[in-house]
């Protein structure tokens, strides 16, 4: 026999039907499988996208997938109200924009890796200078700020232990472990992720942070960590092939002289560009890589933007820069 109403007049068995209804709604909302032909027909007939070459379009969907290509890059080409493509937009333009983002990831990753390499070199040098070359030293929680960040330090040390654990697919780690029974930090850093490197810097003693930050004299050790944190997030996006052009993070780089020089607007005291978007990464690179390297980075970035705008005539420069978090005068960053 079913129970009567519970307190408040609800039936005890009502949650069962509630869960069942939720599942039903989820199933109804789930997208159905579509063949490549159906996908192209949907784009053309339902969404108004021009497809000049159906064979090329099908092969592209086979190679990239509908979700990665259309799901990831359609928004810039749609009418905000109708959610249909702007008249004249072609499939080829979306493909061109996809490849633009692909090239963007390669460009940013190239220079982020330079920052990562330099940072790892500075950390391993100054940490080893203080504590010595034994792996037990960087695996010892008390050599970090364990008092204030015990959980985070333990997590870091555990991850470092796994990085140098045997058997290792890193030949250089396996070599040192077998021959010397020790993997010094300057070897281990080569296998460390940017996330591990960022955490290592954050939780190592302040005196070592200060020494490392002297390689970047314009900023304090805390401000350097802000740069590193945002760069690490961007690196992950690049390395995992995620969408980069509209990159955003909850972390922020510090206010810089460049924000002021470029006349970036403020709202409630916060700069509206270059704090936690892709332009923030550009600013970080301006301070963290050599001047000549940054000039080359800026040149190649400018060429990528000009090239994609030529290939995507229905995409305006203002629209693209806004999505990227770039001010209109972003190229004056060197002046």
Feature map (PLM): residue ranges:
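Extended intrinsically disordered or low-complexity regions, especially N/C-terminal cytosolic tails and loops
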Residues: 1-233, 245-335
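Acidic/aromatic/glycine-rich contiguous surface patches that form carbohydrate-binding/processing clefts
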Residues: 241
């Amino acid at each position: 026999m079913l129970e009567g109403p519970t307190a408040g007049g609800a039936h005890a068995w009502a949650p069962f039907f509630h869960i069942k209804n939720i599942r039903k709604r989820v199933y109804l909302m789930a997208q159905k499988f579509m063949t490549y032909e159906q996908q192209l027909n949907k784009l053309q007939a339902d969404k108004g996208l021009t497809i000049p070459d159906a064979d090329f379009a099908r092969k592209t969907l086979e190679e990239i997938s509908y979700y990665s290509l259309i799901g990831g890059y359609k928004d810039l080409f749609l009418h905000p109200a109708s959610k249909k493509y702007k008249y004249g937009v072609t499939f080829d333009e979306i493909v061109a924009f996809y490849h633009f983002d692909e090239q963007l990831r390669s460009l940013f990753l190239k220079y982020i890796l330079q920052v990562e390499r330099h940072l790892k070199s500075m950390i391993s040098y100054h940490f080893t200078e203080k504590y010595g070359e034994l792996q037990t030293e960087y695996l010892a929680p008390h050599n970090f700020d364990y008092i204030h960040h015990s959980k985070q330090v333990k997590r870091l040390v555990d991850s470092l232990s796994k990085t140098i654990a045997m058997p290792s697919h890193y030949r250089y780690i396996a070599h040192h472990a077998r021959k010397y029974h020790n993997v010094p930090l300057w070897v281990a850093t080569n296998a460390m992720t940017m996330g591990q490197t960022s955490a290592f810097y954050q939780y190592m003693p302040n005196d070592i942070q200060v020494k490392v930050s002297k390689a970047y004299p314009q900023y304090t050790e805390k401000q350097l960590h802000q740069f590193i944190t945002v760069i690490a997030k961007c690196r992950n996006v690049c390395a995992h092939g995620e969408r980069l052009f509209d990159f955003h993070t909850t972390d922020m780089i510090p206010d810089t002289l460049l924000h002021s020089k470029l006349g970036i607007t403020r709202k409630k005291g916060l700069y509206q560009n270059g704090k936690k978007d892709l332009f923030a990464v550009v600013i970080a690179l301006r301070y963290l890589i050599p001047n000549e390297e940054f000039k080359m980075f800026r040149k190649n970035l400018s060429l990528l933007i000009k090239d994609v705008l030529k290939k995507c005539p229905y995409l305006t420069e203002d629209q693209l820069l806004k999505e990227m978090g770039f001010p209109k005068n972003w190229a004056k960053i060197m002046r």
